[in-house]
């Protein structure tokens, strides 16, 4: 590989804020924030909204969806709205 043209691959601390779980993973992601990990070292820090620790597909905590669509729900909610005086 040519020197100086590749991004810096280093350990990065990813934080799933929904589940409050930290992942230390090798990455080239750029960030200016840092955070001290449980091992005592300071790593670049990236906050995540969703990861495998909090996503319903991976956790098994899926919610059931209703069978009626959005339009049917709208019509049901506002069915008598135009007829009221």
Curated annotation (Swiss-Prot):
Record key words, sorted: Ribonucleoprotein, Ribosomal protein
Organism per entry: Stutzerimonas stutzeri (strain A1501)
Name this protein carries in UniProt: Large ribosomal subunit protein bL31B
Quaternary assembly: Part of the 50S ribosomal subunit.
GO-annotated biological processes: translation
The UniProt record lists the keyword NAD: no
Lineage: superkingdom: Bacteria
Family to which the UniProt record says this protein belongs: Belongs to the bacterial ribosomal protein bL31 family. Type B subfamily.
InterPro entries named in the record: Ribosomal_bL28/bL31-like_sf, Ribosomal_bL31, Ribosomal_bL31_B, Ribosomal_bL31_sf
Gene3D superfamilies per the UniProt record, alphabetical: Ribosomal protein L31 (4.10.830.30)
This protein's record includes keyword NAD: no
GO molecular function, one term: structural constituent of ribosome
Pfam families given in the database record: Ribosomal_L31 (PF01197)
Coiled-coil zones: none
Cellular component GO terms held in the UniProt record: ribonucleoprotein complex; ribosome
């Amino acid at each position: 590989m040519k020197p100086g043209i590749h991004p810096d691959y280093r350990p990065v601390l990813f934080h799933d804020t929904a589940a409050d779980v930290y992942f230390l993973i090798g990455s080239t992601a750029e960030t200016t924030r840092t955070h001290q990990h449980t091992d005592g070292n300071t790593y670049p820090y990236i906050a995540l909204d969703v990861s495998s620790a909090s996503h319903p597909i991976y956790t098994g905590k899926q919610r059931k969806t209703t069978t009626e669509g959005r339009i049917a729900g709208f019509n049901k909610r506002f069915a008598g709205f135009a007829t009221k005086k």
